[in-house]
């Protein structure tokens, strides 16, 4: 599995406090039956091509000023249908439904299934002076993208 740790060195993760935690109170483990929504961002295609596009801004380069339109860029970079299908089918095999949302998959799942899928713990946070509607569900620590889909997934956001 691919370990995700917010970019901080693993040795420092135990001391890393997310910004939202400074303004919220950790109530503890979230109710495993509660449903949460999050997004899975799929890897874009043609990353090497994207990195070379900086040269369209350099007057000394032969591609200077050769800008592409949004549609052309999207057709060259959007995640492949095979990646959408692979991740969507994998989630479905785990009893998790997803819908396509642009270049991402929007997921609605129980906390229990989400924790099992990503090998993480999700806690419930509230704002100490807020109302019940101010509840936030966030993972505590790192998580792992399952190896079956790690070649397709760039980022998971929302928990």
Curated annotation (Swiss-Prot):
SMART domains: Pro-kuma_activ
Pfam families reported in the protein's UniProt record: Pro-kuma_activ (PF09286)
CDD domains registered for this protein in UniProt: Pro-peptidase_S53
Lineage of the organism: Eukaryota, Amoebozoa, Evosea, Eumycetozoa, Dictyostelia
Annotated source species: Dictyostelium discoideum
GO molecular function: serine-type peptidase activity
InterPro entries named in the record: S53_propep (IPR015366), Tripeptidyl-peptidase_I (IPR050819)
Signal peptide: none
Protein name: Uncharacterized protein DDB_G0291952
Highest taxon listed in the record's lineage: Eukaryota
Annotated PANTHER family: PROTEASE S8 TRIPEPTIDYL PEPTIDASE I CLN2, TRIPEPTIDYL-PEPTIDASE 1
Induction remarks: Down-regulated in grlA-null cells at 16 hours of starvation.
